[in-house]
Amino acid sequence: MSRTLLVITTYNQSEYTKLCFDSLKNIEDDVDVLVIDDCSTDDTVEMCKEYGHEVITKEEGLGLTDSWNRGYYEFKQRWFVNESGQDDNYDYLIIANNDILIPQGAITELKNTFTKWPFSLVVPTSTTNGVGHNREQSIENHYQGMSPSCDDPNYYQEIQDRIIDVKTQIRESNNLYQLDPKRMKMFNGFFFMMNRNIINYEYSDKELFEPKFIMTKNEDEFNWAKLIPKNDFASVCKTSFVYHYKGVTAKGDLRDNAKWKETRFNSG
């Protein structure tokens, strides 16, 4: 069975991490969780242990891109060949913020996209607010009647269930093509899923992303410099929904951490 490594990046804001962890209780069984913590000063690390999630900590804050790259390296390190000579462990890597809610079924829909289309990176839909600058990912672009329920975190599972209901109805009318994934020129980095083909775009043996972009620009630069020139566009899976609170962590809050390197914000 192909498995997925879900890497969640954290820096404080443990109240949102708790909400995220609670949503993970009902997701698919073939998903393992790894938390990369950027030197939180609250109870985030203790909470990870309470929920039974593996967590990698840092002695000092090194930024979001460092966390992404550590997650990617762990993904690569956990490939191995078992006694039967078959690849084992993870075929898929998800990198996600902690301020999200993942409904049951959303990851399966993303995985199904990889089995049908030749993509290396796929993203879910979210609310218009949650997708920020990339409105192509907004669920309201692809379905009618999802708002205002989709904007309420209490309905995140119901929204995913309604999407599957629509998918079933469209399949019965032979119009399933309407829900085919859409290639995009950009994607929002709050949640993205990759398959093993992503290794072809790595920055170095241990890094997928350009490390000089310490907090911002990382997904955009990766997309424009790596994926698009190879005609391997990030694509939105219209049948997957992940709720994103958005704007939970701000640079001003991060600077309060005494161990937070000021160089994080000097990404030129």
Predicted regions and their residues:
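Short, acidic, metal-binding catalytic loop of nucleotide-sugar glycosyltransferases
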Residues: 22-31
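N-proximal low-complexity "stem/linker" segments adjacent to membrane-targeting elements
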Residues: 1-23
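A conserved acidic beta->alpha catalytic loop
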Residues: 36-46
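A short, conserved alpha-helix in the catalytic core of glycosyltransferases
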Residues: 185-202, 212-240
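A recurrent flexible, glycine/aromatic-enriched loop bordering the glycosyltransferase active site
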Residues: 156-165, 171-196
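Short beta-strand-to-loop acidic/aromatic patch adjacent to the donor-nucleotide binding site
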Residues: 85-101
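Conserved donor NDP-sugar-binding/catalytic core segment of glycosyltransferases
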Residues: 101-151
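Glycine-rich, basic loop-to-helix element that forms the pyrophosphate-binding segment
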Residues: 59-85
